[in-house]
């Protein structure tokens, strides 16, 4: 009886929003220091942390566990706010096109999981729309793991409420999640990427027919002093965020936000991917990632040196650095040095970090390139679920 009552209340809540029409729904995105930047300021190497994690963490073969080697939240900087439960409990989440599940820390978190206690935690006992599930949940990332159990409640994103199955995390890797500015992750990927066959949040939203179009778009401000840091738009795009027209590419494989790339050039020289390769468009990543050997050559070309926190260049040389161009759908998408250099002022002087990372993904998934937030900041990006395509337009 209690279960039916909960569902009835959910339906009443949902029905009250149907009359709002097909307006664009907006989620403000905040930009905060990444885990890597936080560790660096503490004098800790993120790479050393990952090495220690890989040595200490045993392989996990439990039911429901899906390795996600492409997802690395060390450099994630953008997140937005959602609510779960009735009354609303607020959480800051990464909207990640590289995954499809929603997870947030649980009030039932293990006392040994220190990362849980530095974040907002969902308390099922305080929500009258909570429905128990209890199925175990586990996901392994390149930078840590998340374990817990499934629950169901009302989730509100951009003013749109949906009845959603999500994961309550009872155990989070202390490194690196204890330093994360976000509470959890909301996957914007396709259903076939979801663990345990859970219907993703955006699919639940689409099923309500409250959006004008079955798309979402992501804008990241390139101005470090600009607040907010960006916006996730559900149902369409905002012409205030771009100039010219969108150029579209069909997704390479049904169910994944990835496309075929036809080359990467540095300056005027075609250097990588001339025979074609896969490019993943990933809002969960802040940097651009490519095969380690290719990124190493690229860094040598621009005179970058690798240290414990990434590739660096002499700040005096930044203005002379070449553009890096990606060839997608017959179009050229060029990043200037202003787009791929992160300029940070420190007490001891300015530091210029190159926002590229090397990552070898084995076949059949790899090798791949991952175009993250520094690419999306330059090219406003539309993710079109109805037509299974991705569009790019020059961001303002």
Regions found by a protein language model. Give the residues of each.
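Zymogen propeptides
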Residues: 2-165, 174-175, 194, 240-256, ...
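Structural signal for hydrophobic/aromatic residues that build the beta-strand cores
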Residues: 82, 93-96, 155, 187, ...
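Charged, amphipathic alpha-helical segments
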Residues: 133-138, 198-207, 303-314
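Glycine-rich flap/beta-hairpin and adjacent strands of clan AA aspartyl proteases
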Residues: 144, 153, 162-250, 338-396
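Short conserved beta-strand and strand-loop elements enriched in small hydrophobics
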Residues: 80-84, 151-159, 218-220, 263-266, ...
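Active-site beta-strand/loop microenvironment that shapes enzyme catalytic pockets
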Residues: 90-105, 272-301
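Extended C-terminal subregions enriched in glycine
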Residues: 309-333
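Short, solvent-exposed loop/turn segments enriched in Ser/Thr/Gly
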Residues: 148-152, 182, 274, 319-320
């Amino acid at each position: 009886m209690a279960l039916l009552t909960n569902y009835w209340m959910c339906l009443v809540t949902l029905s009250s929003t149907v009359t709002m029409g097909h307006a664009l729904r907006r989620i403000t995105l905040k930009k905060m220091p990444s885990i890597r930047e936080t560790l660096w300021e503490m004098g800790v190497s993120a790479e050393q942390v990952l090495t220690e994690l890989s040595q200490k963490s045993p392989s996990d073969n439990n039911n429901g566990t899906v390795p996600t080697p492409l997802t690395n939240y060390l450099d994630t900087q953008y997140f937005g706010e959602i609510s779960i439960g009735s009354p609303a409990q607020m959480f800051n989440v990464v909207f990640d096109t590289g995954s499809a599940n929603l997870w947030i820390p649980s009030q039932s978190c293990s006392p040994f999981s220190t990362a849980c206690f530095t974040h907002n935690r969902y308390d099922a006992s305080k929500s009258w729309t909570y429905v128990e599930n209890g199925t175990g949940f586990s996901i392994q990332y390149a930078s840590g793991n998340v374990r817990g159990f499934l629950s169901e409640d009302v989730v509100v994103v951009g003013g749109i409420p949906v009845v959603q199955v999500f994961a309550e995390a009872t155990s989070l890797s202390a490194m690196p999640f204890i330093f994360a500015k976000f509470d959890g992750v909301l996957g914007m990927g396709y259903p076939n990427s979801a663990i345990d066959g859970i219907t993703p949040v955006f699919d639940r939203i689409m099923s309500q027919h409250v959006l004008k179009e079955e798309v979402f778009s992501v804008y990241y401000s390139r101005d470090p002093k600009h607040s907010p840091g960006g916006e996730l738009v559900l149902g369409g795009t905002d012409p205030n965020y771009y100039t010219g027209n969108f150029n579209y590419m069909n997704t390479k494989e049904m169910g994944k936000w990835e496309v075929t790339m036809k080359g990467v050039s540095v300056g005027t020289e075609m250097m990588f991917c001339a025979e074609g390769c896969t490019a993943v468009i990933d809002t969960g990543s802040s940097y651009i990632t490519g095969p380690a050997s290719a990124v190493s050559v690229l860094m040598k070309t621009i005179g970058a040196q690798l240290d414990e926190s990434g590739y660096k260049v002499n700040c005096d040389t930044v203005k002379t650095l070449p553009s890096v161009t990606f060839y997608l759908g017959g179009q050229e998408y060029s990043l200037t040095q202003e787009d791929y250099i992160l300029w940070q002022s420190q007490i001891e002087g300015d530091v210029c970090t190159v926002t590229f990372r090397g990552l070898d993904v084995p076949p059949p998934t790899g090798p791949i390139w991952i175009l993250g937030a520094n690419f999306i900041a330059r090219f406003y990006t539309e993710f079109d679920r109805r037509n299974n395509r991705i569009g790019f337009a020059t961001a303002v």
